[in-house]
Amino acid sequence: MKKIIDVNAHLHTPYSFSAFTDVRQALDMAAAEDVRIVGINDFYSMDGYREWNDECATRHLYPMFNIEFISLNSEDQAAGLRVNDPNNPGRTYLSGKGLAYPVILSGKEAQMLADVRAESNAQVERMCAKLNAHLDAVKAGFSIDFKQVVKDLTRGSVRERHLAKALRM
């Protein structure tokens, strides 16, 4: 009888936000659990693909290359329609699976992806400003330095979870 191969096609890495300290830790854990096919799946980023590919090769794992986007439909939000996020009406997570590596994105498409990531980062920067206004209002005695968060806690894509992590530090 053929053995079924264990697959995890949806692993977030520090290239967007991750519970793992680095790509190596994620892949070491997958290998230890005999997961043989592993997919990187970061928000708005393909930046980790090379490292993912190389680290998979050293562990004899089969790499998948994926990407994830979050969309918001304001009409669905107003109507309370939940798509695939049970807590946020109108929000939809879209995940592209089995993308090419090396990345063959150029020109208009590469610029569109860069623009989406820049807007996502700008949105989180606006969240940081609101968080700092709240911290000031409650006289917390500290604030979150957005540029420092980007520098110390990210690999270019900043998420609201990075702000939460900075707040706990």
Locate predicted features.
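Extended, H/D-rich, highly charged conserved domains that either
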Residues: 155-169
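A metal-dependent hydrolase metal-coordination microenvironment
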Residues: 2-158
